[in-house]
Amino acid sequence: EDAQNIIRELDEALMLEGPRLDEAQIDALKSYHMSPFRTPRLAGKVYPSGPDALEKALDNYCEQFPVQRAISRGVVDRVVGLLSPHIDFRRGHRVYAETWQSIEEAFPQFEQVFLLGTDHSGSAGRVTLTQQNYATPWGVLPNDPDLVNTLIEGLGKKFALGEELHHVNEHSLELAAVWLHYFLRRAKGRTSYKNMPTVIPILCGSMTPYIYGQKKPSQDDNFATLLTTLDDAMKKRRTLIVVAGDLAHVGPAFGDPRTWDETARTALRNADYAS
């Protein structure tokens, strides 16, 4: 009887596979699709929920940490990518501010943005699309349904959308999207600015099989399809690729038993270079 009660409670808590969990997932996906945009989950928690307060916060970050190495005018036309953090703004605001400001001169040119971020719940080797629009307190960042549909057709619906619910709570894309939207809004005043670019959100699961040499991305049909399709799209429109990917999470704040001192930092840095 005790075992039966435990099983029932786990089932009611949606912690067991079965009809109840399947139905809950279907309902959650319907709710996500019916919304006009993906609801920002971290507004009011990691960053201000009001547009004016958010703008003031990011203004302050950028004023406090002006860019150290902005791209030269001769390089503006060749900017294609940016590696952004996705840690909380309290700890990462300096890196966010300096990184995004470094390519500010290029923002008026972009017609589409591929926003790739870590899926902290994603399956190994999985990329997960969504047809939903992302949004920030400033409004909607429009997706490109035609391009997303082309990707879904090439990758297969099960692979491309099987973990779409991860978009609901995943923070990596949301935090980068806030900075993206901030700089796109700043670009509006430039003479070369045209329209708000489309923003295609893509979550990326664990790369463990590739890191440990179990297989190569070039031998993966799904990755080949993804890259070929995105490459074709880039030939038609001026594109920015944003990768929202943190590096090492180290120190007591992330569960390490000791403080991450300069000796340990140097060892990690050397290991990174060696790899």
Residue ranges and their predicted role:
Residues 36-275:
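Active-site histidine-anchored catalytic micro-motif
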Residues 1-42:
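Long, charge-rich, low-complexity alpha-helical segments
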